[in-house]
């Protein structure tokens, strides 16, 4: 194959060639069907771009593509270098995405058939030489090759170059088979099996054959068959789709400018214009076409007549006409549909892969778990989770009955209890691997909510919102004059550019606005109207008070009419009213009674009253009391006129009326003459004590009559920001969020983190992860982050510091700790010089502005104990009683007692006083007694306690033991062990239940004797369950007997088990019951002590004293 010269610039295709039909709509019906299938499958595939078009071509290199499409026309008739068919490209050639010639599958199929036919024609041409000679002469005359218009070269075509000069995309390889249509790598891509070749009689007349052009096929029928193949296919399609019509023939569309309506041989689908995605061709590109030759024009006439293609320029004008384009942009519809499909597809993908999380429990939603889907936001939740949420207090709607969705806050009335599929037709749907989880697998059939669409969703049961209805409908504009094709379910109303011209509310004028929805605006023409009486006029809009005109006026001014009545004597007293005025009420034929209405005039005429002739004659009076009701008084007592029957208004009332205050709390009596109106009231001085609506303040209004006491004060409470106060009227509940905002950047202290404006009031500075850059008191390393507080956190670096009293040098002390106490006493010498500070290690002075109050340690002169008075450094010790405690004992040493020192000395003084009393006789005889020796320091220390009865009994026992030569170590009288075995608490508990103690002691004695006499080294006894006090007695007695005691079980079945051990368990010499009985018995009186006294040295003693000083018999004084 000869190679064409290189091409520079853009490709030029001959727009007049047969194969270059940029806006061919021959197969629009099939394209519409394919497009509808693509729309219905978009959600399932989540693929929003149409599949790549079929390109019937071979894999031709880029250089060969340039050679194929490059050819110049030579007017001189010279043959070009390239023998291949070439086309002059127009700049408007589209990319592979457009629906031009190279994207039409039916065109490729037709080219394939033409290719076979031309091959047959070429074989016949080679066999006949005369035909070849004629063919060469024809070429020289016309200067063109027949193969320029042969469709067989279309198989060499590839995707057209982009208008911007981009490299064309790689063409798709097709594998030819005996099936219908081409197959892409074994896959059937397009099937067009209904095309048939038209019969020869369907072809056009022979005059359509171009002059000077010889076809390779010498047969005329073969020539017609090749030329009219496209036309026959088009006729076949029109028979299959008789309802199709071009877009400009849609009902309600306006005619295209510069074009007469075509004959309707067949109707095309109304959506064909919407399915065509081919962009308009610029007018500049149309003007750049080269001039057509005569041959080209004739060839174009034949081709246009055979294939009935649409003119390119007219199609461009139709697409650019703004009146023909639908008012709803398809781009916006695709955008909305894409958002819906993205939401639904995302839900399907996440539910299928189990990656969707429940917003309540934050757990993954499994394919087998029961779920519930919100019909407002389409979020999916676990059924159990949404039940718990719906019953929780947090889900309750404010002021409404129902519960709120956790995602969209949509209020629902009923709590879901059943697990249903997304469309709601099947309960408890079973999960299938081939279906969407939680769906029933049937068609959705849900209606579009809130839209005027009769169609239902035709997708399978799915989560998320249903896609918009894909159907189209013809909708009338608001004024009803034009109709437009719009998407079904579109809530947008259609408007045309015509005026409305509906009758306005006045009924006279027409609406001059453009086509609009709703009612027309009231008529805006201003008219001047006069009232019925003619005294007042006004300017109103046309249509105001329609139907109220009486021919003279149009409204009532609410003034007295004042027109002259027919009588000519009186004027109309009614309020301004439509004509005519009523008759004069004083006419004789109208007046039937006296002025008070109690007596008819006929009776008065019989009594001699004169008859009335005109309205000016007075009405006769009956002479009775008028009795007409007056406006004063009350409902219980109505005041009446007290005058005699009279004409005109009744006079003032002479009685009094009781009126109430505004709040009806108090009443007041006033003369009727002072009442100016029937509803006369006054204000009392009672203040309202009810709470205002804010709940914080009281009303406090005087004579309040309000039902809702609104608070006029300003709230004034601080808002959450802490900087501003609420400026709204005082209200209940929490204040609103502070609406103040700053338009300055809010940064952290170091400036690394920034919050850009607007910044709501009260917003805290952003958190920063950088290290704090402030100047710190210490030079230790900084470990805390940047912060907004004024003070940095304390430094925690461990250091060594002295305590406050300089006692210890402590380690591991945080740097921020300053005053450290070691916990030891201060021991610093106080200013008094005698004492030391007793406080723990502290800071500062030991005593601040206060004297030392520690006790004085100076020994007393009389007893030697310290002074113990508050510290008195500069003064002598005060004379006070010594409060030190000393130990006193009796003469035998058995009794010991701690006594205050001053009390001990007073006891000695009492003893000394008794001794002085014995010498009182000497004082009576004139003698003197020296008492200085009675109270001495030594004698004070020798103070003793008096022996008691036990001391005497113990003394007797000692003497008896000495008499029988019994050693004291043997303890014959059980003096040391008798009181040491049993404790005081055991004795007190045993006194409460002696019988129980006796039984326990018997059991223990038996147990101890059994283990000592038996063969076993241990033996146990279990006591029955008992209370805590009895168990404590058993434990204490077990210690006395040398037994082991353990408590088992729990209350109230807790008991004690005692165990006797040989060699350890011993019975005490005296039982506890015996000790208690001896103590409880009455003691015998103690023996009378006998003291030996020396003979009285005083010769003057009386005989009475001698008798009293008899010797005391000592029964234990055994003398040898």
From Swiss-Prot:
GO terms for biological process: inflammatory response; negative regulation of MHC class II biosynthetic process; negative regulation of transcription by RNA polymerase II; protein autoubiquitination; protein ubiquitination; transcription by RNA polymerase II. It is found in: Nucleus. Residues 22-295, 1081-1109 are annotated as: Disordered. CDD domains: NF-X1-zinc-finger (cd06008), R3H_NF-X1 (cd02643), RING-CH-C4HC3_NFX1 (cd16696). It comes from the Eukaryota. The modification Phosphoserine is found at residues 50, 82, 95, 129, 150, 326. Residues 142-159, 188-202, 222-254, 282-291 have a biased composition (Basic and acidic residues). One of its GO terms (cellular component) is nucleolus. A zinc finger (NF-X1-type) spans 453-471, 506-525, 567-586, 632-655, 694-713, 721-740, 832-854, 863-884. The keyword Aminoacyl-tRNA synthetase does not apply. Its main location: nucleus. A zinc finger (RING-type) spans 358-409. Residues 994-1062 form the R3H domain. Residues 111-120 have a biased composition (Basic residues). Changing residue 20 to A: Reduces PABPC1 and PABC4 binding. Its EC number is 2.3.2.-. This is Transcriptional repressor NF-X1. Isoform 1 interacts with PABPC1 and PABPC4. (Microbial infection) Isoform 1 and isoform 3 interact with human papillomavirus (HPV) type-16 E6 oncoprotein. Keywords: Activator, DNA-binding, Host-virus interaction, Metal-binding, Nucleus, Phosphoprotein, Repeat, Repressor, Transcription, Transcription regulation, Transferase, Ubl conjugation, Ubl conjugation pathway, Zinc, Zinc-finger. Isoform 3 is polyubiquitinated in the presence of HPV16 E6 protein; which leads to proteasomal degradation. Isoform 1 is not polyubiquitinated. Binds to the X-box motif of MHC class II genes and represses their expression. May play an important role in regulating the duration of an inflammatory response by limiting the period in which MHC class II molecules are induced by interferon-gamma. Isoform 3 binds to the X-box motif of TERT promoter and represses its expression. Together with PABPC1 or PABPC4, isoform 1 acts as a coactivator for TERT expression. Mediates E2-dependent ubiquitination. Residues 9-26 are annotated as: Interaction with PABPC1 and PABC4. SUPFAM superfamilies: R3H domain, RING/U-box. One of its GO terms (molecular function) is DNA-binding transcription factor activity, RNA polymerase II-specific. The keyword Repeat applies.
